[in-house]
């Protein structure tokens, strides 16, 4: 894990502070950025999100899908949790906390937006950071690669229907044209671009050209994330300064969801008698979120100033320290799978 990944929470925290200060003292900058929009797509945010997502797609070798039959139990475990359990538990927790438990502190419209942001996080399984978590737990690299590749392909077809279903079920209006456009812009097109780039660059046996390209692009992916956080918290600065408790309220159900899903996945992996090299990455993949996609879709559907966008960024803030704690736990319990 590099310097940026290891201290990502610190960098995100600093970006949050910069965004809030800038939003308070130079709001005209954010008004200008917000005006650069067409068909619910903000050009500045779209460019930054592409900067985050495109390098991830280049990193993934989709030809690994041919090895899908080599780890059937681990793959089945993660796919079931990612697509049949996690989105629904996230929606349930969002509804429970913001419609009932936190109702005295959050107005109904804002509560809907927070729930929407949580749902978008729950429907987007993690992509790039999974390789880091797998490496830190000494996971099977081939299994991890196959699982991520399959998830990304499924995401093209399943993200919009599941997100639309859950948003509709929680009484949130779903602009389907914008949702489908978001999937095309932030999943399908970057995926195709990543595949073509990888095919063009990866023509040597030692992958030297591809590795050099990825080394150049990796820092820019983090820059895109941090710039996105600065902008989002700049747009949200007035709300956050007047209601700082909002971040804590959003973080609570996200923490419960993350630890709960990991516990379920890890327990099932033990029941299925998976080796630790599959159990650990399977549980990490099941637990973590593709927060870059969630942020992009939240902005497209609900706007830069929305509670949904804020909720997805809180997801970024929460995920890294939580996942590092789960890496520690997985490494300490390796003997459970002996």
Predicted regions mapped to residue ranges:
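Alpha-helical transmembrane segments of multi-pass small-molecule/ion transporters
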Residues: 1-58, 63-287, 291-338
């Amino acid at each position: 894990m590099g310097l940026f990944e290891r201290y990502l929470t610190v960098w995100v925290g600093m970006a949050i502070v910069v965004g809030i200060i800038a939003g308070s003292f130079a709001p005209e900058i954010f008004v200008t950025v917000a005006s650069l929009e067409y068909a619910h797509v903000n050009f500045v945010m779209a460019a930054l999100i592409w900067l985050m997502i495109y390098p991830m797609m280049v990193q993934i070798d989709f030809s690994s899908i041919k090895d899908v039959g080599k780890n059937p139990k681990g793959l089945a475990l993660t796919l079931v949790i990612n697509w049949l359990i996690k989105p629904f538990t996230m929606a349930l927790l969002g509804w429970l906390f913001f419609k009932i438990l936190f109702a005295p502190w959050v107005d109904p419209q804002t509560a809907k937006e927070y729930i929407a942001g949580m749902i978008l996080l729950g429907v987007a399984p993690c992509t790039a950071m999974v390789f880091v978590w797998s490496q830190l737990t000494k996971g099977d690299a081939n299994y991890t690669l196959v699982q991520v590749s399959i998830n990304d392909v499924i995401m093209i077809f399943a993200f919009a229907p599941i997100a639309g279903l859950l948003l509709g079920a929680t009484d949130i209006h779903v602009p389907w044209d914008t949702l489908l456009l978001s999937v095309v812009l932030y999943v399908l097109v970057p995926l195709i671009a990543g595949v073509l780039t990888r095919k063009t660059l990866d023509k040597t046996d030692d992958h030297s050209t591809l590795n050099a390209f990825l080394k150049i692009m990796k820092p820019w992916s983090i820059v895109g994330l941090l710039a996105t956080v600065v902008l989002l918290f700049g747009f949200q600065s007035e709300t956050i300064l007047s209601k700082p408790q909002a971040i804590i309220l959003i973080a609570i159900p996200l923490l419960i969801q993350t630890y709960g899903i990991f516990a379920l996945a890890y327990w099932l992996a033990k029941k299925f008698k998976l080796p630790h090299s599959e159990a650990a990455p399977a549980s990490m993949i099941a637990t973590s979120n593709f927060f870059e996609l969630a942020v992009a879709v939240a902005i497209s559907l609900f706007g830069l100033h929305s509670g949904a966008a804020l909720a997805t960024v809180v997801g970024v803030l929460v995920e890294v320290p939580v996942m590092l704690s789960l890496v520690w736990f997985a490494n300490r319990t390796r003997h459970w799978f002996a």
